[in-house]
């Protein structure tokens, strides 16, 4: 996969281009190893400096990075024996939501998540990660299956929001989201939710009610996009950077507000720079969360989940 850089990463991109050019020019007659090492060190230092001071708008753009790992990527790296399950048994199979049975270090679990696309065709097929009601009903069907078989549920959140099209509204988008919120609050199995990219409004919440809610370092979670907020408050999407700052949508800010439990650190430069490393970090987090939740009874799980939901809005 070709590395793509955001505008604030352009100085890093220039250094990386020079490094690649030197590697291509290096041969048995011309040894450029020392110069390559010098530039690599400079690139790493610049990357550390750049990513140590990202503002909320830059984090928002990182959360949408086109090379960022999606749900199926994490499934490939973290789980084994994944068996995808399709359809809501009522209308259709929504490819913006994927899910199925898998094993986490041998332990059976149910995995569910939003899925965006890479190619143009795949993006259209996945509806850019925006589920319709049938997607949320599929997710609920899999959660109910997990409940019957006493399987922990692991969800990955990455969506701009639920699809707002006329057809989706006619098929009961609001009802599907509301039902998921209610049913997830009553599940008697452990539920671990992780925001891996964009956590957009009710479309994210519909698979986001859990005993543990984690966020990747450069993910976001908010009731509206910065552009949408800016369009409402300032009548201009150009104020998106200002909106992002006041919305408190970053993992660090949400952790301060006790709205999430943990922040999963990303590799230097973001999750898209090293799929294996971010998957390793996330897998460790999931295993630690499961180990903690395994020690709780059904009543304790439900009481803690209820207390968590009732605490929202209080600092």
Swiss-Prot record:
GO terms for cellular component: acetyl-CoA carboxylase complex. Its EC number is 2.1.3.15. InterPro entries: Acetyl_CoA_COase_a_su, ClpP/crotonase-like_dom_sf, COA_CT_C. Pathway: Lipid metabolism; malonyl-CoA biosynthesis; malonyl-CoA from acetyl-CoA: step 1/1. GO terms for biological process: fatty acid biosynthetic process; malonyl-CoA biosynthetic process. It holds the Pfam family ACCA. GO terms for molecular function: acetyl-CoA carboxylase activity; ATP binding; carboxyl- or carbamoyltransferase activity. Keywords: ATP-binding, Cytoplasm, Fatty acid biosynthesis, Fatty acid metabolism, Lipid biosynthesis, Lipid metabolism, Nucleotide-binding, Transferase. Component of the acetyl coenzyme A carboxylase (ACC) complex. First, biotin carboxylase catalyzes the carboxylation of biotin on its carrier protein (BCCP) and then the CO(2) group is transferred by the carboxyltransferase to acetyl-CoA to form malonyl-CoA. Belongs to the AccA family. This is Acetyl-coenzyme A carboxylase carboxyl transferase subunit alpha. It comes from Haemophilus influenzae (strain PittEE).
